[in-house]
């Protein structure tokens, strides 16, 4: 299986090939290019095909179009790569409530080829430490209100290198 991941942790931790399912993509609607980025298919394609002004995500008091979500995800993706040094295959912990900005962060992680490790806001530092260590999450995006437990977890983990609020 070929991958664009520079960090091969996920691929290296798959079950042996004989224990993996057989993937059959024989139907036309299941034929995908050799390299596929889900952010390109789920978000960017809508903008490219002229649907950028349509509502994409709604929350109380907020409504973003595909173009607005794409713009936010692109900005976050630039921070991930240029400022935080994320490379394809890195695990990026996401710590936020279910809101539009969390969706933008998830798409940004997908755009850069990293792996999103989403966490629930109710998790405590000890539980976050377990997730960080098992996933070997090297970077984190965190809503400011949830930062205290993540900082405490990061202090106990040599793996997590950078947190952005």
Locate predicted features.
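Adenylate-forming
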Residues: 43-46, 69, 73, 92, ...
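Flexible, non-catalytic linker and terminal segments flanking ANL/adenylate-forming cores
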Residues: 1-37
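Solvent-exposed alpha-helix faces
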Residues: 74-78, 97, 133, 145
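Conserved AMP-binding/adenylate-forming
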Residues: 62-64, 79-126
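Conserved N-terminal alpha-helix of the aminotransferase class I/II PLP-enzyme fold
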Residues: 56, 68-79
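AMP-dependent adenylate-forming
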Residues: 41-68
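Structural core segment of the AMP-binding/adenylate-forming
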Residues: 1-9, 111-165
């Amino acid at each position: 299986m070929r991958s664009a991941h520079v960090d091969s942790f996920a691929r290296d931790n798959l079950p042996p090939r004989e224990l993996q399912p057989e993937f059959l993509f024989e139907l036309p609607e299941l034929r995908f290019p050799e390299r596929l980025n889900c952010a390109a298919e789920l978000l960017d394609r809508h903008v490219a095909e002229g649907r950028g002004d349509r509502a994409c995500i709604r929350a109380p008091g907020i409504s973003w179009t595909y173009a607005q979500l794409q713009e936010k995800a692109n900005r976050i993706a630039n921070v991930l790569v240029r400022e935080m040094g994320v490379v394809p295959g890195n695990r990026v912990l996401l710590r936020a409530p279910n809101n539009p900005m969390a969706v933008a962060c998830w798409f940004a992680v997908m755009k850069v080829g990293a792996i999103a490790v989403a966490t629930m806001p109710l998790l405590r530092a000890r539980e976050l430490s377990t997730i960080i260590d098992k996933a070997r999450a090297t970077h984190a995006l965190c809503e400011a209100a949830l930062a205290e437990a993540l900082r405490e977890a990061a202090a106990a983990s040599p793996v997590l290198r950078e947190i952005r609020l």
